[in-house]
Regions:
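Histidine-centered divalent metal-coordination motifs
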Residues: 90-94
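Conserved beta-strand-loop surface patch within small alpha/beta domains used
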Residues: 1-85, 96-154
Length: 154
């Protein structure tokens, strides 16, 4: 995963701005080997929870759900330009950056990664302080998500 420092700072800024709710977004690039562009998305978890707390028991403070219209527009726009989805990002509120069981479940479709080449960036934010950032990618051999490096480009 390659990110320009400026783009990583955009993710940090969004994480702080949307605190105490989790933020979320999508990363795209011409190829998985090129620096990714950040696409901020709206976390609609609170709206879903308000409409159907049985199906969506968690609030945006501990969960995220990317607006499906934004997801479609960003993915379709990337494909139209010959680009690919290189990753997704979200923040964790007042806890460490880790890939939770819920994160894994959302990243999968029928026991396979929905976006096999995508990297999932998780930002740990406490108030206005970003404390940690980690990235996770699919490992076919272990059939699980594992830590991967973020290559930060100045």
């Amino acid at each position: 995963m390659k990110l320009r420092r400026h783009d990583l700072e955009q993710i940090f800024e969004q994480s702080r701005a949307e605190y105490p709710d989790e933020c979320c977004g999508i990363l795209t690039a011409p190829t998985v080997d090129e620096p990714s562009q950040v696409h901020r998305c709206r976390n609609i978890q609170n709206e879903l929870h308000a409409k159907d707390p049985q199906q969506y028991p968690r609030e945006a403070r501990i969960a995220y759900f990317i607006d499906p219209q934004q997801l479609y527009q960003i993915v379709a726009g990337a494909e139209k330009k010959g680009e690919v989805v290189t990753g997704f990002y979200h923040s964790h509120i007042d806890c460490d950056a880790y890939f939770s069981d819920e994160d894994k479940e959302r990243a999968m479709a029928w026991d396979e990664p929905a976006y096999p080449d995508a990297v999932y960036v998780v930002v740990s934010v406490y108030g206005d302080e970003v404390r940690n950032t980690k990235a996770f990618g699919w490992n076919e051999e272990s059939r699980d998500f594992v830590d991967v490096e973020i290559d930060i480009i100045d």
